[in-house]
Amino acid sequence: MADLDDIKDGKDFGLDRPQQHKAFYLKGSGALDWGMQSRLADIFNPKTGKTIMLAFDHGYFQGPTTGLERIDLHIAPLFEYTDVLMCTRGILRSVVPPETRKPVVLRASGANSILTELSNEAVAVSVEDALRLNVSAMAAQVYIGSEHEHQSIKNIIQLVDQGTRYGMPTMAVTGVGKDMARDQRYFSLATRIAAEMGAHIIKTYYVDKGFERITAGCPVPIVIAGGKKLPEREALEMCYQAIDQGALGVDMGRNIFQSEAPIAMLKAVHAVVHGGETAEKAYQLYLDEK
């Protein structure tokens, strides 16, 4: 027990400086609990407010697609150049070294494949297992306008409810319904519904016309999906336009690991997202690093 006779009365109380409460920097996240904000701060760089996620969760429905045949050989060398990893729990446990020290957004929906209806997903991971894996968020697909729209929205609701109990953020990933055009109106609808259900981050697609309306109408951070493989210059232009129009990051897979020079491409994306560089300057960086 401490010697009570040796306890000195405190003197430096800073009486002329009231304690300050700094608002949390991330859009739509100011009212969240400390643990939730802490995990979001792992994902979104506190200095820039933005993020670069490396997505390599495609195998959960595509299998060993090009570039993902061997995660240990082709993807692991990229870890140090990204902010966040997005993968499944199977890959996380079997391939990702624990000493990687990168926050993880865990793919938490599944139970489908490219051979069946893609929108027919279920929650595939419990929040308890996500906590065991020490991840920073859980992600699930939401398919507005699809055959299984209702179930996909329920999946988001389930993750939000369970995650809120333990301080675990949820990222909703917008899929495209069969009969919906891939345009601003559709993605405004899909992102807003996901946010209204309580998702803390929305991953969606960039569109050439009206993307600023999508980000303005969504009360939580939007990160863009990379989508299909594009020429590097076009992919960087997409990144630049998305950030310029209000996206707070990118979650790219094929445009990174299917690039001729994945590390150079990640450095170029970093220049756009965190450095504010134009696509032209970032592409020159890519060529220099290639």
From Swiss-Prot:
Q: Which CDD domains match?
A: DhnA
Please provide, alphabetically and separated by semicolons, the GO molecular function terms listed in this UniProt record: fructose-bisphosphate aldolase activity
UniProt cross-references to SMART domains, sorted A to Z: DeoC (SM01133)
> Where, by residue number, is the active site?
K203
Top-rank lineage group of the source organism? Bacteria
Name the UniProt key words of this record, in alphabetical order. Lyase, Schiff base
EC annotation from Swiss-Prot or TrEMBL: 4.2.1.-
SUPFAM superfamilies assigned:
Aldolase (SSF51569)
User: Which family does this protein fall into?
Assistant: Belongs to the DeoC/FbaB aldolase family.
What protein name is recorded for this chain?
Answer: Uncharacterized aldolase PM1278
Protein source organism: Pasteurella multocida (strain Pm70)
